[in-house]
Amino acid sequence: MHAPILETALLHHALTLLAPFATDDGSGDGGFTGPSLVDFFPQAFLFEGTPFEINRIMMVRFIAVAVLILLFWLGTRRMRMIPGRGQSLIEMTVGFVQSNIADGALGKEEGKRYMPLLATMFFMVFAMNVTGIVPGLNISGTSVIGVPLVLAVVAYIAFIYAGIKKQGMNFFKSSLFPAGVPPLLYIVVTPIEFLSTFILRPVTLTLRLLMNMIAGHMLLVLCFSATQFFLFTAGGLFGLFSIGTLAFGLIFTIFELLVALLQAYVFTYLTGVYIQLALVEEH
């Protein structure tokens, strides 16, 4: 007798975890309200009003970093010649970054040199991205500009450092005054090179990651909030629509996992490409 009530309560709780944002528009009529940009600016619950205030998104970032550190510690604390499952998984993922990103973008020699930076960046971006599909967290640490911007600045510093270390101050000359261009054309070419190399690279790195994570979050919240609304608020025949919204939400969750991985790959690979371009004497 009580089983259907219990199952309904559990389903409602599960959907609440998947769509933790309000689906009531506040008018009291139970109307549906979709996801909002307000989701990305939650109120602080610790140290409010100080430079160190902590809100929900900051907590998600702390959790992502802590879990990442814990997984690597557990997988590498007892390294063996014949690796266990944890060590094998870490070796496989690190090997993926080494062969497909570091070596692929920079070659073996330079790839080995910049591998620590690129691996750290890849796993950091992926860990921050994937929190968007974790029930109870439900938002990516990279869906607010802070982390994407910091990572883009790191990439920016890395390729400028690589260029100066390799070429000295000639790096700026070769970047702004490409060889083979008629001198008169430098009036046009140099401003374009300056914008594309020193301004647009960090901006596009930041915005590409940020916009993808925002869009993914909005669609997931829309799907699961709509499911909750159709099933528990609208009722009647509208409950049938919840089947479609739930199915689409689950499919899109898998898609978002792939997006999280792809964006980590793209961000890190482009960082490697920018470093490689800085190492070339004339480009």
Tell me what each language-model feature is.
Residues 2-283:
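Selective transmembrane helix interface/packing segments
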